[in-house]
Amino acid sequence: MCKVIAICNQKGGVSKTTTTVNLGVGLVREGKKVLVIDADPQGNLSQSLGIENPDELEIALPSIMEQIIMDKDVDVTKGIIHHEEGLDLMPCNIDLSGVDVSLVNAMSREFVLKTYVESMRDFYDYILIDCMPSLGMITVNSLTASDRVFVPVQAAYLPVKGLEQLITTIYRVKKHLNPQIQFEGILISMLNARTNYAKDIMELIKKYYGESIPIFESKIPFSVKAAETSAAGDRKSTRQNSSHNTTSRMP
């Protein structure tokens, strides 16, 4: 049975895309069929997987969602890009910002992405959705389409403070739109474990959320080298410097 996981945080720069890529590659290496969906108009996931100019793509997530909004038949085989590491990618580009506006007046507006995801379940073991850094309609669509939500959070005060709003939104989606959604867990990223500040942040997360939400023991350390290689486009090096143990908790 396919499992759909949203990688979500309204704060940017907390390793959502890095987590999505690493999780996807890890699952592929365990023999799973994986589709990753870029649901961010910035197209960071698409670029991380080698799409240099996602804005030039004729078919991407925005065009698929527009077809669904207009109640047109969608060929689910179109637009999927197969990556050399075994992942399939549904890319995204800046046009998703326009879709976000279109959704305001759309019928069943929270379920547009779910319509696409449901059509893909039979082909994959896992579908991972890299959410945009906001709590707008596209993110609500991503949560409505998912079975689980995975929350990377930077080991710093402001990102942790923003968790409350994110978790409230997820519970509202669960109550009104998607009763099946569950927390996969919180993954602490960009951690400098040598500082007392980072340790205090970790304890704060455990204190407020540890009883209700799983917190992964694996953590992504802060790495200057990883940040530099990511900025330079060295995707392989970035993956090698990131946590690779998270998939051990995936069923």
Region spans (language model):
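P-loop NTP-binding core
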Residues: 1-239, 246-249
